[in-house]
Amino acid sequence: MDWLYSLIYGIVEGITEFLPISSTGHLILTGNLLHVPWPKEVKDTFEVVIQGGAILAVLVYYWRDFLKIRHIGHDRGQQRLWLGVVLACIPAVILGVLFGDTIKAYLFRPSVVAWALIVGGVLMWLLESRKATPDTHDIENISAGKALAIGAAQCLALLWPGFSRSASSILGGMLLGLDRPTATKFSFYLGVPTLGGAALLDFIKSREILAQIGVVNVAIGAVTSFVVAYFAIGWLLRFVSTNNFKGFAVYRVVVGVLILVLIARGVLQNGSLA
């Protein structure tokens, strides 16, 4: 059955990693509702490592764009873009190094994740209800100041598990004047170093833990995550070009309430997830 659990985890990760609905919240539901019999440390490490598949999907989807980095020496747009990505990563790196263990110890609880989903959904609805005219329509035109601010917004997902890294970075970008497609694309780019670094570090540190379920099952999860995420990226980009995020806002609230109901009924334990 391990292969089936790996497949399901990969599907859930691939769908939810880049959509603003919290992969953390959905992986919690998946693991608990399916009663996955893996030790907790295996489950936690597996969930992080298969993010590598989703990150690879971004690299493949945008491979032509990423190749433009070859011209960074004389292309001002590429210089602005990658300076922005580096600056946007700084707040998350600092926060993760200083407080990562504390956050995992005290904040990774289903109830915390549920309220993050609900509050994030409400904020998403309110942001989409305001009348504002975006002033940035290309990721190469994002200023250094805006990039750093988006990186700070992304930290909300670290401080409040379940808020969603993609949601916090996309909403932060929109609040700063990026249009939806531009904010979404920059969030994808930002996820490469942020999530890729975490996945690689966990893989290096925890190879012995992952050995408990075998390299084949890890590969199944990562490959499935890659394939599903690739199509999820394309779908989301098409969606945001003509739609707003209010549907995601409602969905987040529904999932958050569902988690709270499951906790109240004893189906889902509210102990620490870290």
Swiss-Prot record:
Q: Which domain of life is it from?
A: Bacteria
Membrane topology category: Multi-pass membrane protein
A GO biological process of this protein is:
response to antibiotic
Annotated InterPro entries: UppP
Q: EC number(s) on record?
A: 3.6.1.27
> A Pfam family this protein belongs to?
BacA
Compartments (UniProt record): Cell membrane
What's the catalysed reaction?
di-trans,octa-cis-undecaprenyl diphosphate + H2O = di-trans,octa-cis-undecaprenyl phosphate + phosphate + H(+)
Which key words tag this protein in UniProt? Antibiotic resistance, Cell membrane, Cell shape, Cell wall biogenesis/degradation, Hydrolase, Membrane, Peptidoglycan synthesis, Transmembrane, Transmembrane helix
Query: Which GO molecular function annotations are given, in alphabetical order?
Result: undecaprenyl-diphosphatase activity
Kinase keyword on record = no
- State the top-level EC class: hydrolase
Q: What residue ranges are annotated as transmembrane? A: 1-21, 42-62, 81-101, 107-127, 142-162, 184-204, 213-233, 248-268
Q: Which GO terms describe its cellular component?
A: plasma membrane
This molecule's function is given as: Catalyzes the dephosphorylation of undecaprenyl diphosphate (UPP). Confers resistance to bacitracin.
Family of the protein in this entry:
Belongs to the UppP family.
Further facts: Bacitracin is thought to be involved in the inhibition of peptidoglycan synthesis by sequestering undecaprenyl diphosphate, thereby reducing the pool of lipid carrier available.
According to UniProt, the name of this protein is Undecaprenyl-diphosphatase
